[in-house]
Amino acid sequence: MASTADFKNGLVLQIDGQLWSIVEFQHVKPGKGPAFVRTKLKNVLSGKVVDKTYNAGVKVETATVDRRDTTYLYRDGSDFVFMDSQDYEQHPLPESLVGDAARFLLEGMPVQVAFHDGAPLYIELPVTVEIVVTHTEPGLQGDRSSAGTKPATLETGAQINVPLFINTGDKLKVDSRDGGYLGRVNA
């Protein structure tokens, strides 16, 4: 059990038998009336996001989620295989559980896997990922019909928009949460 004062991003709540992760929260104390907490909750299994409001001080059931450091090893058909960094046990996770994170998953990458009651729930990639551009069109100096970006294909097959000066073979820093370009890695 946790009070609304204990809320933080990433805390997993158990509501009506389902697991919900706090994505965003805000304590509100209006001039008139009792204080309350506005939250944005994401269903851990389905990914559905809902808004929920709690009165301040209310106790809420929390779920015990064990986050383990793992290393991504390889893809086996529709499964992604991760190795636990402590006991070296391998965990095959289905593509549905890995979800959108597969866009930036590289072999040997450190990844956190969240478990509840021994079953894997979801994975968390590092916030920034260093990844190589395998294909992009050459950017022309006077080509400014767009906002100065062009599409690029990464070594994982993902496509992102990059500035015009990026070339094939460049190593980039990419935000794994939204696929945004963060910068070029200096060799």
Swiss-Prot record:
Coiled coil: none annotated. One of its GO terms (biological process) is peptide biosynthetic process. Keywords: Cytoplasm, Elongation factor, Protein biosynthesis. GO terms for molecular function: translation elongation factor activity. Disulfide bonds: none annotated. The keyword Protein biosynthesis applies. Signal peptide: none annotated. SMART domains: EFP (SM01185), Elong-fact-P_C (SM00841). It holds the Pfam family Elong-fact-P_C. Pathway: Protein biosynthesis; polypeptide chain elongation. It is found in: Cytoplasm. PROSITE patterns: EFP. It comes from the Bacteria. GO terms for cellular component: cytoplasm. Involved in peptide bond synthesis. Stimulates efficient translation and peptide-bond synthesis on native or reconstituted 70S ribosomes in vitro. Probably functions indirectly by altering the affinity of the ribosome for aminoacyl-tRNA, thus increasing their reactivity as acceptors for peptidyl transferase. Belongs to the elongation factor P family. This is Elongation factor P. It comes from Mycobacterium marinum (strain ATCC BAA-535 / M). The lineage of its organism: Bacteria, Bacillati, Actinomycetota, Actinomycetes, Mycobacteriales.
